[in-house]
Amino acid sequence: MSADENNLIWIDLEMTGLDPERDRIIEIATLVTDASLNILAEGPTIAVHQSDAQLALMDDWNVRTHTGSGLVDRVKASTMGERDAELATIEFLKTWVPAGKSPICGNSIGQDRRFLFKYMPELEAYFHYRYLDVSTLKELARRWKPEILAGFTKQGTHQAMDDIRESVAELAYYREHFIKL
């Protein structure tokens, strides 16, 4: 398949916390959809190696969540650093979307972009400057039509690929039930 500038790149990161000055990326996953939200391909899901010292900085929520999902063990066992994960992700994306064309897509994606800017700047630059943030629609629905929210439930596994799939499904749900096309 040739790269299509209308395809959308969806991304999710798991981090050791929310502060890019202190915390680090521990998992990255991407997938590509067409403009109609049909999933075309899933990219690599990569546990990003971090030192024991870095992992020790996690707060209780992150320790509990990422240990429970098995991510901490995968991070410790991983041989891929941030740069390797960045390059593998870009290599996957080149097949599906030309550089600079897709907005960065996901849930609360501004937070992920802050970490990409700091730790994976080449990948961050691969995206268009625009955002397709599903959480914007969630916040609007909460204020304008709160009953809509009951129709979509997330599993909340805090595993990157699961979270991306849920983001795509959530946007499709809002397209059907909230946005008048």
Swiss-Prot record:
Enzyme Commission number(s) from the entry: 3.1.15.-
Bilayer-spanning residue ranges: none
Subcellular location: Cytoplasm
Domain named Exonuclease: residues: 8-171
Gene Ontology BP annotations: DNA metabolic process
Keywords, comma-separated and alphabetical: Cytoplasm, Exonuclease, Hydrolase, Nuclease
Pfam families: RNase_T (PF00929)
GO MF, one annotated term: nucleic acid binding
SUPFAM superfamilies named in the record: Ribonuclease H-like
Cellular component aspect of the GO annotation: cytoplasm
Active-site residues (renumbered): 129
Family: Belongs to the oligoribonuclease family.
NCBIfam families cross-referenced by the UniProt entry: PRK05359.1 (NF003765)
Reported function: 3'-to-5' exoribonuclease specific for small oligoribonucleotides.
Protein name per the record: Oligoribonuclease
Gene for this chain: orn
